[in-house]
Amino acid sequence: MAKTQIRNGTSIEVVSEDGPLPINVMMQEGVKALTKILSDHLQDGQSVDNESHSMQFVFKNVNDALDEANYQNPEGNGDVKISEIKSDGESDVVNFEVQDMKRKTLDEDDSIEEYITDPQLHLDGDKGEIVFDYGSEIITDNPEGIGERISQMIESVLPNGFPRDSRGRLHAVVNGDELNITEETDIDVTYSNEPVTSGYIDGIEYNEDEDSYEHDGCCPHHHHQTQDQQNNRQYHHHHSRQTHSQSQHPLSKQPPTSSKYRNYNYHDYNYEDDQESIPVGNAPNFSMLMTGNHNLCLFCEYYMVFGEAPKNMIKWYNKNYGYDRLPQSSARNGNSRKSNR
């Protein structure tokens, strides 16, 4: 039979499928447990008020009549009264009226958490509040828009940004072959007899003025220079490009090396010793970034904090942005295998 509800209370129906049940068994086992449950958690956890509640047991095929009786809950939480027996043919109905004597003085405004011992399922106040901070900017659902945002964040920390090709795509995507970082060597570059002109080379745009390009007040640690150069450009991040006439070599049996194709983006990771930098192996010193007098690129910041140049990062950057022309994919794979031997 279904569970029925009464005003400000709950009716619980118990059905026996196997014939008559002794009332003393039900009283000792069932009523004891159910009255305790009703006393503590009626109507989905709401505290018991001062009114009475009833529960109903239905026993199928019960032929013996039960006299009206009172049952005192051993827990002392309330009285159980067998009020009546109703017969509807195949089943008899026994109504038990439960009146809670202990909780009459409870304040109706008391929180339900007082009676529940599982804090993980019933959190109160700030403990039950989960805050997701998405920031003040709206994130677009367009995948291209998300990619553009990520590209802007990455580009903001690169020394020279991301070069783009004629269609506006990032050069790192156009030339996105997997990089196999090994020890630094001058890898062979497949020679091309095609003339090189000002414009786009492998997706990188440049102009003739970049031959003498330098960042004023930036990156004092990068390129390996002579003492005169260091005196004259102590705090210049200098990028020197091989002129196009120098990068074009006549046909010969020995292919040119990659150093002939370095452009102004190329970074030397052989940093000069700096007394201000921390010894290698010591804990990072981020205060170096606060006391510096000059703007630093990402690699120099790493060097100042950790005391050594990020060689693998610089190799990756040079591989993608430090050359006017790069080897073909097949040649690159061959050179990678050579350097891994």
UniProtKB/Swiss-Prot annotation:
Keyword ATP-binding: no
Disulfide topology: none
Region (Disordered): 211-264
Keywords, comma-separated and alphabetical: Cell cycle, Cell division, Cytoplasm, Cytoskeleton, Mitosis
Amino acid composition bias (Polar residues), ranges on this chain: 250-260
GO CC terms: cytoplasm; spindle pole
InterPro entries per the UniProt record, alphabetical: IBD2
Keyword Nucleotide-binding in annotation: no
GO BP field: cell division; mitotic spindle assembly checkpoint signaling
Subcellular location: Cytoplasm, Cytoskeleton, Spindle pole
Function text: Part of a checkpoint which monitors spindle integrity and prevents premature exit from mitosis.
Family: Belongs to the IBD2 family.
Protein name: Protein IBD2
Organism lineage: Eukaryota, Fungi, Dikarya, Ascomycota, Saccharomycotina
Gene name of this polypeptide: IBD2
